[in-house]
Amino acid sequence: LLEFNMLNTLENLIKLARERKSSPVEGSYTNKLLSDKSLSKAKVLEEVNELIEAVEENSNKIHEAADVFYHLLIYLEANDIKIEEVMSELEKRKK
């Protein structure tokens, strides 16, 4: 059940990013990130740093990890990097 929910959540996030990219919604934070690659890049860097701090301080780790996932997925989509291709690359690296 947990695995199903994880995959479902990830698929929904990817679907949201692609829907917002093809049909922008005014005022959407996701659309703001998709349309401003510089902002999207800055947010990925910021969120990774916040995650590192959270891990070191043992505080808010899950929240910050979720922020990293979200912002990275949006950054990839904004730059036309398909998550399927990333997953395929990871699959090739299995030993």
Labelled PLM ranges:
Residues 1-65, 69-95:
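Flexible "arm" and connector segments at domain edges
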